Amino acid sequence: MAVWIQAQQLQGDALHQMQALYGQHFPIEVRHYLSQWIESQAWDSIDLDNPQENIKATQLLEGLVQELQKKAEHQVGEDGFLLKIKLGHYATQLQNTYDRCPMELVRCIRHILYNEQRLVREANNGTSPAGSLADAMSQKHLQINQTFEELRPVTQDTENELKKLQQTQEYFIIQYQESLRIQAQFAQLAQLNPQERLSRETALQQKQVTLEAWLQREAQTLQQYRVELAEKHQKTLQLLRKQQTIILDDELIQWKRRQQLAGNGGPPEGSLDVLQSWCEKLAEIIWQNRQQIRRAEHLCQQLPIPGPVEEMLAEVNATITDIISALVTSTFIIEKQPPQVLKTQTKFAATVRLLVGGKLNVHMNPPQVKATIISEQRAKSLLKNESTRNDCSGEILNNCCVMEYHQATGTLSAHFRNMSLKRIKRSDRRGAESVTEEKFTILFESQFSVGGNELVFQVKTLSLPVVVIVHGSQDNNATATVLWDNAFAEPGRVPFAVPDKVLWPQLCEALNMKFKAEVQSNRGLTKENLVFLAQKLFNSSSSHLEDYSGMSVSWSQFNRENLPGRNYTFWQWFDGVMEVLKKHLKPHWNDGAILGFVNKQQAHDLLINKPDGTFLLRFSDSEIGGITIAWKFDSQERMFWNLMPFTTRDFSIRSLADRLGDLNYLIYVFPDRPKDEVYSKYYTPVPCEPATAKAVDGYVKPQIKQVVPEFVSASSDSAGGNATYMDQAPSPAVCPQAHYSIYPQNPDPVLDNDGDFDLDDTMDVARRVEELLGRPMDSQWIPHAQS
């Protein structure tokens, strides 16, 4: 029988556990409508630790989305209309969530299927053997759920004991009242005659002695019941505190760490639904125990009996108040972080959420949340509970928001949608620290009333550190500060301390994560790429990655000190590489057509045994965000040629594929792939109209063509003398032609004696020509101008 069919038959807590597996990360409706397809896929065959399996994971994601879309299309009728919209929405949601990290979808569904199978097995035979899909996370989640299973009967047991104590005490009070009535009867005996008084007095004395003895024994019994109940509550609170520590200090902190790494491009932090279900169970059990303790205290006040129980109850009451206080304050979290590079006068958003809002009825009196930006120093003072002035470091517009309770999802949250940092007040900088190294944080504050104003909590939570910029040119260095902080922040740190030095392998992991996210590619940094980066950073010639494994990288090396002989830092160079790949070269990087991380000498070594016309693309050492072509062409002058680097500006005018297509003497993409086979699908289609075709205004439209003057004869031959092309080279010179005489000729060659360009000596005239092409052109620029 299909697992889903059996899962739908679960009852009680098993059903709740199954429902808690689903949420925004994977809606239960998707599981229901695609149950057969989901269970027929080989989720378990994918190795989550093998990056090469990403292709399989992507295929499964695409298949899931396609199945959802097909299911949506087949919905008809009035009832089917809403379902069609909902399933279509889920298809888009899953695509957006897992497109960059399909492995997380596999991990998610494996976790769901494993737990469904476990719950079904437990329901069928009461056993829970470890299945093939069991992992450390599942085992820990199982342990948490088992602890809840222990807490429920324990809490019910103390409830029963409390009722027993209450009944016993009520009967004791009745008997105590009887004792008082007997004493009153003694006072009335004086009115009787001696014989009758003696008879009645003897009977009353005997009754009083018996009752006093019973009351004395029963008082001891009551005291014993009270002590036993208090001891049971002490044990329950120990178990509750341990469970709360696991959930808040382990699971929630891990979620926050995943959220922090997601800021560096790591996988999404995942849904809060499971965490919320645990926190709500905690809140429910804690509140039940607190009410029991309060009732026990009331019983003691109602009938005081000397002994240790008052002190014990006061202690457990204080303990459970501390526990519930920690739960409420710790579960006030930032679900959606504000941007960590925050530009003034720019709209930004954030979302805060209280994971126990529904269970503790906080939403009955919706609280308001206020956001302020504070300095690192004030953040330190807040965490130390030091009294500080309400001193903010700037002004945020639209910084107040009322929390809303969403009945369907059971979430209590506040969505700040239109905040804007109007101004910022900076602190005095330390030493060489720049403004882009100064960290701030957004402080979210509120006040929650729990249990009908029985308890009132002042709650605060801090965002991840933010770096404030006033101009886009600061974004690069601000991102470096955020990357370093997110990657290397240690648990429980003082805000916002990070190590000044880290091991090179740690930085490699952070760079690779950021690279894949920024370039939006599954092709990350290889071992060879990391060796190249290490050589650049450490100014070393070693080609063995192991030689760098014990070396440390300081923050100054990363983004404060310039690389040797350059006017930029290591990070600025690396960020430039990501920028040009992301904006213009992503498909070529994904195709493996860009080698990228090699220096000039390495490029020559790779090309030396290749046929003429073999070329490779490498990132420029001399220009940030530049990429250059190195190729082999054995001539009388030299064997290796290096073209002046192209940048984002160049590719916004003419694409890399078209530029390579123009250079017919570039034949093979290293190592031996035909150029057209690799790049032809990216060429801009050539219009079918003849060259003499006229535009609406009567002019022939010019076209840009990539030319290297040293190879101009080859280019001219291949162009077939087509006069509608304007030759363009990424160089200080333009190929001489009479009707392009608006600029003076530059006699210097395009390539220097080493086959390289000197970027600082001359002006790139061709780029100015390209700029002019976007403006109204003088008739002298138009070949065959029409009158």
From Swiss-Prot:
GO terms for molecular function: chromatin binding; DNA binding; DNA-binding transcription activator activity, RNA polymerase II-specific; DNA-binding transcription factor activity, RNA polymerase II-specific; protein dimerization activity; protein homodimerization activity; RNA polymerase II cis-regulatory region sequence-specific DNA binding. SMART domains: SH2 (SM00252), STAT_int (SM00964). Keywords: Activator, Cytoplasm, DNA-binding, Nucleus, Phosphoprotein, SH2 domain, Transcription, Transcription regulation. GO terms for cellular component: cytoplasm; cytosol; nucleus; RNA polymerase II transcription regulator complex. SUPFAM superfamilies: p53-like transcription factors (SSF49417), SH2 domain (SSF55550), STAT (SSF47655), Transcription factor STAT-4 N-domain (SSF48092). The modification Phosphotyrosine is found at residues 90, 682, 699. It is found in: Cytoplasm; Nucleus. InterPro entries: p53-like_TF_DNA-bd_sf, SH2, SH2_dom_sf, STAT, STAT5_CCD, STAT5a/5b_DBD, STAT5b_SH2, STAT_linker. CDD domains: SH2_STAT5b, STAT5_CCD, STAT5_DBD. Belongs to the transcription factor STAT family. Carries out a dual function: signal transduction and activation of transcription. Mediates cellular responses to the cytokine KITLG/SCF and other growth factors. Binds to the GAS element and activates PRL-induced transcription. Positively regulates hematopoietic/erythroid differentiation. This is Signal transducer and activator of transcription 5B. The lineage of its organism: Eukaryota, Metazoa, Chordata, Craniata, Vertebrata.
